[in-house]
Amino acid sequence: MIRVLVVDDHDLVRTGITRMLADIDGLQVVGQAESGEESLLKARELKPYVVLMDVKMPGIGGLEATRKLLRSHPDIKVVAVTVCEEDPFPTRLLQAGAAGYLTKGAGLNEMVQAIRLVFAGQRYISPQIAQQLVFKSFQPSSDSPFDALSEREIQIALMIVGCQKVQIISDKLCLSPKTVNTYRYRIFEKLSISSDVELTLLAVRHGMVDASL
């Protein structure tokens, strides 16, 4: 039996995935988590074999959660699930150790296939994302300015885009407000911007966030 943990900040998504997988032979959803932080606690408590990890969540987010999770539980297989097909997320999640990558447009059969393959020690990348990664490999240079940012800088940039205040970011990441502001100015400098509004527009333009949200 493959033990699965579902991680997503939207209750409707978590419930939907859990219900879809409930009738699949050989799979058991052992729990749900609504944030990256909670996924770390649930993984320790429930000992899943596979984690379906939403990429864009408040707090530490799926990228940082994957990195932390695999550092403490290297045998767990993480399948990233996101609405975003554009870099830098697919590349960064795979570099962080994710064994699979799905879009939220994936059907039940594809999701089950991904879970079973990564559990068996293989990788699974959805066709759309695989195609995008192949095309990118032939490009002489990156088209996304966000590739210049570190994982921590991307994490903080997305929290800023999500309208989270400096003190909230500070509390969630266990950093001082001064350090958060230092990251913020460094992000602005690397992206050649000067405001949170410009950061948000740039993030939308390069597929870092869903423009409809």
UniProtKB/Swiss-Prot annotation:
Disruption phenotype: No longer produces the secondary metabolites diacetylphloroglucinol (Phl) or pyoluteorin (2 antifungals) or HCN. No longer protects tobacco plants from attack by the black root rot-causing fungus Thielaviopsis basicola. 50-fold decrease in expression of hcnA. Greatly decreased expression of genes controlled by this two-component system such as aprA, hcnA, phlA and pltA. Loss of expression of small RNAs (sRNA) RsmX, RsmY and RsmZ. Loss of the autoinducing signal (which is unrelated to N-acylhomoserine lactones and induces the Gac/Csr cascade).
Gene for this chain: gacA
Record's keyword annotation contains Iron-sulfur: no
UniProt-recorded name of the protein: Response regulator GacA
Biological function: Member of the two-component regulatory system GacA/GacS which controls the expression of secondary metabolites and extracellular products. Acts (probably primarily) by activating expression of CsrA1 and CsrA2 antagonist small RNAs (sRNA) RsmX, RsmY and RsmZ which bind to and prevent translation repression by CsrA1 and CsrA2. Involved in the regulation of secondary metabolism and in the synthesis of the antifungal factors cyanide, 2,4-diacetylphloroglucinol and pyoluteorin. Involved in synthesis of the autoinducing signal (unrelated to N-acylhomoserine lactones, induces the Gac/Csr cascade).
DNA-binding residues: 166-185
SMART domains for the chain: HTH_LUXR, REC
Entry keyword Transcription regulation: yes
Listed result of changing T182I: In the spontaneous pleiotropic mutant BL915-2
Keywords per UniProt: Activator, DNA-binding, Phosphoprotein, Transcription, Transcription regulation, Two-component regulatory system
InterPro entries noted in UniProt: CheY-like_superfamily, Sig_transdc_resp-reg_C-effctor, Sig_transdc_resp-reg_receiver, Tscrpt_reg_LuxR_C, WalR-like
NCBIfam families in the record: PRK09483.1 (NF007018)
GO biological process, one term: regulation of DNA-templated transcription
Domain called Response regulatory: residue spans: 3-119
Molecular function GO terms recorded: DNA binding
Protein modification: Phosphorylated by GacS.
Positions of post-translational 4-aspartylphosphate modification: D54
